Amino acid sequence: MIKLSKGFPIIAKRTVTLGLCTLLVACSALKLLYNQLPTVGYWWLDGYFDVSDQQAPELKRGLREVLAWHKTTELPAIVALLNDVEQHLEKPITGDQMCGWFTRFEPRINAVLDRTAVMAAPILARLTPQQLTYFDKAIAEKNKEWREKWLDPQADDLLDARLERAIENLERVYGSVSREQTQAVKARLAADPFDFERSWQNRLRYQTAFRGWLVAYQGRALATPEAKQAAIQSLQGLWRAAADWRLEDRIQTCQLLADFHGLMTPTQRLNAVKTYQGYQKDLQSLHLEG
C-alpha cells in the first residue's frame, strides 16, 4: 500500500525497503526476501559503485552483520507494531491512526539508517575516482529512467501507473479487488495528484548532498576514532534528512491509505488480518533464528 518517496536517496532507500515491507507494504516471500537482503544489497550497490575485489569481502560481511543485528534487535519491535495494526484491520481506520503507526515506525527506520552508516562510511570513504565516475554515470542513467517514467508521461498515463501500483499492493494484502473498487481507488488517486516535479527536485537535491559527502571524504584514512565517528555522524545526518517525511505529504498519504481501507469488504479485511498474521509469524521465526 505504501511506496517509498520517489525522491528518496540512493542507499537510504535500500536500507529501509525491508522495514516498509514489514509494516504496511505487502512483500511476497517475506522470509526469503529478508534473508537474501545482504546478497541483493551487494549487487544493487555494485551497480552504482562497481565494487572492487578488494572491497567486496568487507562490504558483504558488513551487510551480513547489519542483517544479523536487525534480526536480533529490531524485529521484536516491528512484530509488536504489526500486531497492533492487525488488531484494527477488521474495522474502519482513520488517517490519524495510520499516521500514528508511521510515527511509531520512524525510530525503526532511523535505527537501520544509523547502523548501516556505521558499516558504510569507512567503505565509502575509500572509493576511487574511477568509482565516483561510475557512480555519476549510474545516477545519470537512473535519473533518465525516472524522468521517462514519472515526468515525461501525460497526466492520464501517470494516473494509470499509480493505479496499477496501488491495486497490486492492495491485492497482496486484501486479496482480489473488484472493478468497482478499482474505479473508486482511481477516483481517490485523481483527487490527490502526486507532485512529481517536487519529488524530482528532492531527488536531485539528495543525490547532490550524498555525492558531496562522497567527495568530501574521498581518500580520508579515518585513522582515528574521532575521524571515523565524524564521518559516520555526517552520513547518518544526511540519510536521516533524506528520509524525513514532510508533514503535509504524511497526512495526505495516511488519509489516502485509510480511505483505501474503507473501500474494502469485511471478507477482504479478514484477508488482511490473515496476511498480517503471516508476516508476524515469519518475522518472529526470523528473530528466533538469530
Model-assigned labels for residue ranges:
Residues M1-I11:
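N-terminal secretory signal peptides that target proteins for export/translocation
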Residues L23-A26:
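C-terminal motif of bacterial Sec signal peptides marking the signal peptidase cleavage site
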Residues S28-K31:
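Bacterial signal peptide processing site
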Residues N35-H70:
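Start-of-domain marker
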Residues Y42-W43, W200, Q207-G290:
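A cross-kingdom marker for long, charged
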Residues L45, E58-L59, T116-L127, F135, ...:
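Short, structured motif recognition centered on aromatic/hydrophobic residues
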Residues T73-A111:
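Mid-chain, structured segments of secreted extracytoplasmic proteins
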Residues A121-R240:
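Extended amphipathic alpha-helical interaction segments
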